[in-house]
Amino acid sequence: MSSLFAQRISMDASPAPSALFNRIEASFLRQGLMQHLGARLVRVEPGLCEVALPYSERVNQQQGGFHGGAMGALADIAGGYAAMTQLADELEVTTVEYKINFLAGFKGGELRAVGRVLRAGKRIIVTTADVVHLDANGKTSACALMQQTLAPVPKTY
């Protein structure tokens, strides 16, 4: 596995949630799609967000593997929330565009997307997300790479 994907993937063993985690989680829980798919917020740090998506019939495609749309949505969310960690509480982000490269398909286990901020400007924020597959034994395998551009927008709730 490349060093890009060999970086730390959280195993859900973290201390009490921070104020930053709680702020991001409040927005994440409003995401109907993420709730429908069964995704969960795993880790939030300044400039970083990790989201998990367990395998289920809600996220598979006709051949039984994870659907590319589910992978893309997971990467979009991880990158978007990584960007949001760089903003004031009254702001959120909206995706302007993203490009994703699918590296391999997987069945079972769970996907983890780790979004990272590359540049946080006043008008645009550029992020990346690495998507990896975790099998039942905890082995990670590269799944997808995403690059994204986002725009800060006022929070509307």
Residue ranges of predicted features:
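Non-catalytic linker/capping segments at the edges of enzyme domains
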Residues: M1-A52
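HotDog/MaoC-like acyl-thioester-processing domains
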Residues: S3-S18, L87, G105-G108, R112-V114, ...
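Residue-level preference for beta-strand/loop junctions
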Residues: L33, E45-G47, E92-T94, G109, ...
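A conserved, well-ordered hydrophobic junction motif at loop->secondary-structure transitions
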Residues: Y55-S56, N60-L74
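Feature marks short, surface-exposed loop/turn motifs that line or immediately flank catalytic pockets
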Residues: V59, Y81, P152-P154
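Active-site helix/loop of acyl-thioester processing domains in fatty-acid/polyketide metabolism
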Residues: G69-D89
